[in-house]
């Protein structure tokens, strides 16, 4: 069943067959059966024909109910619908269950129980009265989780009973849905980017298809092309009309790097440093996508999402919309990595200029701080949010730990990063604005140095 949309739920397998159906006799059904057998035995001993007929009636009634219930199953169909199927942590989603009696017989009492993980709340149970032939019933319940992840809903269990209360059978539908709980996000203030981009609100650049008259890559003439764009040298060479290519719009790029190393974070739970970093990465992704950037998510183990298109970036606005869901789904289930370094992420970044780099780091030792510093060389602009996990556990850093964190920030800033220390409970929106203020100093320091080898964004924030 597709998550978020209605779909039929089919019956599961019947374990035990008729024997299991007989095991579903209620106390009333067993009493009728026992009374009928006892009456039949007494009638045989006493030679009372009327008593024998009464005994057979009492014994036959529960057996007929079992047979009818087992054979027909009342042909109950069900659908489940999630609204919505993807929610931020701490937000409720509603699950709608719809049951329909598609047989010609009315049902007895129906008891529904949907299996949900305990992290989403108690298992919902519903009791439906008699459902007429062709009738429908709809119930709903709410689920909520403070922890991100993917949670299965189902299968739905349905307990059937006959109109006389003689027998109860349980059926399990095989279909299930998946609720995706994504990280919490917060809106970020518009901070204008410096560099060669045409504007932060557009996130686009103009890339010429030619560097000079001799470097032209022409294309064939198409009806409606301006004759002033005809390239006569190429026309003479190829024997057909060739025109110069127009300037091609190129979306500015942004890489969001998330440090997931287990050794870089301390503590667990929704208020831990790691969860703050995941939430921050999700907020940055959505913010940059809204500004028109081609965005990708990169982790310390070198994994890149969406991973399609040139360099792993989405190639169009439509693809970005799909990629946003893919990246948020990835962040919903991202966990700590067992790696100890950032070298794999650096290998991905050093392949070429990747535009803007926004990183969320955990604890950095001297070696990993040096690797992070080298990442700046292949990025047009770089902003780092560094979490001191020791402070997140103890409430604040003391002495040597605080001095070490400040030393790592100094190393990043000297290499051209705009680096911000993240303290426990800090709001990303405020740190985002603070990064814009600090970048003025960073960009001024970089303006006197060489920037060869980088294109696109030539500075950090302004």
Can you say where each PLM-predicted feature lies in the sequence?
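Extracellular/lumenal glycan-associated context and N-glycosylation machinery
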Residues: 1-79
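Exposed, interaction-prone extracellular/peripheral surfaces
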Residues: 1-23, 27, 190-192, 223-462
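An amphipathic, basic-hydrophobic helix/alpha-beta surface used to engage anionic
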Residues: 50-52, 60-312, 356-360, 374
